[in-house]
């Protein structure tokens, strides 16, 4: 059962979200992927990343980022709805999430990052949770959310991705953000399991991180 919550119009989502999502889609679309005898039904949605429309949207959101102008959840949901048509949608969403987390990490000062690297693992986890709380405040839209610890986890009710994608593939975006953020702060590779999915009938969306072997 898919969620029926509608995306709101109040600007409360960072423009980094739609910008990185579009840039990731563009980067995954390369001319050398188009082979003779290709299945047009599959390849046409992929070519959207190289279209003039997408390039114009990327330019638009770059300007929005410069101006630090928050976006409405409805705007982001519209873009998510465009990406979920693609056969590689889950890959795009997860990679976009990783890039958002990497950007947030790199925006911290060099001194801060070096200090975090020297902290014991428990303190690193707490720092990761604090950073996640700050970041998801700008990514969750109108959804209610919380970030847990031991392990670092995320729970969102009424998430943008569940609203936009009844299939649940878009939820890979939040998995990518959470896993990469914890990876950067702890210095240990993490993945995120989507334990519950609101779009697939769960009462909420929940992601749990774990260290990769």
Q: What positions do the PLM features span?
A:
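Non-catalytic recognition/regulatory regions in large multidomain proteins
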Residues: 155-157, 177, 198
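Active-site helix/loop of acyl-thioester processing domains in fatty-acid/polyketide metabolism
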Residues: 172-187
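Beta-rich nucleic-acid/ligand-interaction surfaces
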Residues: 192-211
């Amino acid at each position: 059962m898919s969620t029926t919550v509608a995306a709101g119009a109040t600007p409360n989502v960072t423009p980094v979200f739609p910008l990185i999502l579009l840039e990731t889609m563009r980067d995954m679309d390369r001319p050398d992927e188009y082979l003779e005898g290709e299945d047009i039904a599959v390849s046409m949605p992929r070519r959207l990343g190289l279209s003039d429309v997408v390039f114009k949207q990327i330019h638009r959101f770059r300007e929005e980022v410069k101006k630090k102008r928050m976006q409405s959840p409805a705007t982001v949901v519209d873009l998510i709805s465009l990406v979920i048509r693609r056969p590689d949608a889950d890959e795009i969403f997860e990679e976009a999430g990783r890039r958002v987390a990497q950007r947030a990490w790199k925006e911290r000062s060099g001194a801060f990052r070096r200090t975090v690297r020297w902290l014991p693992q428990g303190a690193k986890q707490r720092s990761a949770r604090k950073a996640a709380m700050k970041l998801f405040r700008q990514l969750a839209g109108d959804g209610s959310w919380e970030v847990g610890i031991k392990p670092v986890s995320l729970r969102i009710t009424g998430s943008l991705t569940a609203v936009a994608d009844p299939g649940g593939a878009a939820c890979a975006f939040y998995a990518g953000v959470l896993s990469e953020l914890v990876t950067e702060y702890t210095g240990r590779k993490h993945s995120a399991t989507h334990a519950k999915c609101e779009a697939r009938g769960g009462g909420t969306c929940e992601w749990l991180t774990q260290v990769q072997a």
